[in-house]
Amino acid sequence: MDSLTERCRPQPLAALGPADAQLHGPAAAGGGVGPRVMLSSLCREHPWQGRCPPIPAHGKEVRQLRHLHRTRPPDTHQDMARGPGLPHTHGLPARPSHVRHQTEPVQVASRWHVPSDGLCRPCHVHQLLHPPLVPALGA
């Protein structure tokens, strides 16, 4: 029977790419399988916009507005391992989302637009400033 469970069964870590090995860390280097490996299998098997299933109430806005902030820091374990951007730093939100009806003040006040020099600029969508990113870069 070609069920969803059969098509999405976990794969050994050896069957995944080097980015997945970085994602799952040295603890999984023995070739074991587990729920995080299962996520990578799902990403390959089904068209999740090229990523793991979105975080509830957050992933949709990120996909719709992916063209607005190309240098934003990552918010998921896959983006952390594969995509460019800054690592998550304590005190800073993982990734902004531009939502018309936004109810979380910390997200509203922390739109990220990071030019190549690492200095803050007003976001061109909401024209809000965020905390400096230079300390987060270790400079």
From Swiss-Prot:
Superkingdom to which the source organism belongs: Eukaryota
Tissue-specific expression: Widely expressed.
Residue segments, region Disordered: 71-104
The name this protein goes by in its record: Putative uncharacterized protein encoded by LINC00315
